[in-house]
C-alpha cells in the first residue's frame, strides 16, 4: 500500500495506546449507559451443547467455530434492554466463543466496548446476526484469530484495531459503513476481506493502516474497488 499514509498522527497513536491499556471494567453496574440499571450476572440457562476442547497449538477454522458449542448465558454479564440484550463482559473460560442468539428470551443485539479487548484470551468468536453494529469490541487483542460477524452493517473505529494475530474476519453481505478510523488498523496477519455493493462509505484510509498482507475482494465498479485502487490495496473482483 505504497500510496497509503505510512504514519499515524500523534493523536491517533496516543488514542490507540490509551485504548490498548484500558480494562474491560468487569461487572460494572452503574447507570451511565443510558439504560435502567438492569446489569446482571447471567443465570444458568438451558443449552443443548457442551463445550469441546480445542487444541491451543492448532489454528481455528471456520468450520470449527461454526460447529462449536454455544456459550451458556452464565458466561456473560449483560444488560437487559427494551429491544434486547447488550453484553458487558465475557467471564467464561472457553477460548472459542459462540455468542447465543438469545438470552432470557431476548435477542442479543450489542456489546459494550472492550468485551473481548486487550488481554482477553479468546481465539475465535461467532457473533449472532442480530448484532448490527460493533465498536472497540476486540481492540488490542493479540489472541483473537477468527471472527464471524455476518449481521453487522456498521463498524465503528477500532473494532479490530491492533489485533495482530487476527487472520480472518467473515463479513455478511450488508456491510454499509466503516465509521471513524482504525477498524482494521495493524491487523498485520489479516489476509482477506470480502465486501459487496452495500458498502458505500469508508471514513478514512487508516481503517486499513498496517494491513500489509491484506487483499480486498468485491464487485467490479463498486465503491470498494475504487477505494482499494485509490490507496493501492490489492483488490480482486468477485
Task: Say what each PLM segment does.
Residues 114-115, 135-137, 157-159, 181-183, ...:
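Consensus positions within tandem repeat domains that build extended binding/scaffold surfaces
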Residues 1-12:
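Bacterial N-terminal signal peptides that target proteins for export
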Residues 86-87:
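Conserved functional micro-motifs across diverse proteins
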Residues 75-83, 92-109, 120-133, 141-154, ...:
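Structural signature of tandem-repeat unit edges
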Residues 25-28:
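Bacterial signal peptide processing site
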Residues 20-23:
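C-terminal motif of bacterial Sec signal peptides marking the signal peptidase cleavage site
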Amino acid at each position: 500500500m505504497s500510496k497509503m499514509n505510512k504514519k499515524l498522527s500523534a493523536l491517533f497513536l496516543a488514542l490507540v495506546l490509551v485504548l490498548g491499556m484500558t480494562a474491560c471494567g468487569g461487572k460494572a453496574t452503574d447507570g451511565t449507559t443510558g439504560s435502567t440499571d438492569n446489569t446482571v450476572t447471567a443465570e444458568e440457562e438451558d443449552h443443548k451443547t457442551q463445550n469441546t476442547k480445542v487444541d491451543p497449538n492448532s489454528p481455528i477454522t471456520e468450520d470449527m467455530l461454526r460447529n462449536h458449542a454455544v456459550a451458556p448465558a452464565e458466561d456473560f454479564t449483560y444488560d437487559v434492554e427494551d429491544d434486547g440484550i447488550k453484553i458487558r463482559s465475557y467471564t467464561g473460560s472457553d477460548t472459542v466463543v459462540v455468542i447465543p442468539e438469545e438470552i432470557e428470551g431476548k435477542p442479543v443485539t450489542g456489546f459494550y466496548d472492550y468485551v473481548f479487548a486487550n488481554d482477553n484470551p479468546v481465539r475465535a468468536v461467532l457473533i449472532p446476526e442480530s448484532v448490527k453494529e460493533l465498536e472497540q469490541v476486540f481492540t488490542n487483542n493479540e489472541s483473537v484469530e477468527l471472527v464471524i460477524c455476518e449481521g453487522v452493517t456498521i463498524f465503528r473505529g477500532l473494532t479490530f484495531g491492533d489485533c495482530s494475530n487476527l487472520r480472518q474476519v467473515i463479513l455478511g453481505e450488508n456491510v454499509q459503513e466503516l465509521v471513524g478510523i482504525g477498524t482494521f488498523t495493524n491487523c498485520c496477519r489479516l489476509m482477506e476481506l470480502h465486501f459487496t455493493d452495500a458498502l458505500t462509505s469508508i471514513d478514512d484510509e487508516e481503517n486499513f493502516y498496517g494491513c500489509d498482507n491484506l487483499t480486498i475482494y468485491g464487485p467490479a465498479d463498486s465503491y470498494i474497488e475504487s477505494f482499494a485502487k485509490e490507496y493501492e490495496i490489492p483488490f480482486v473482483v468477485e
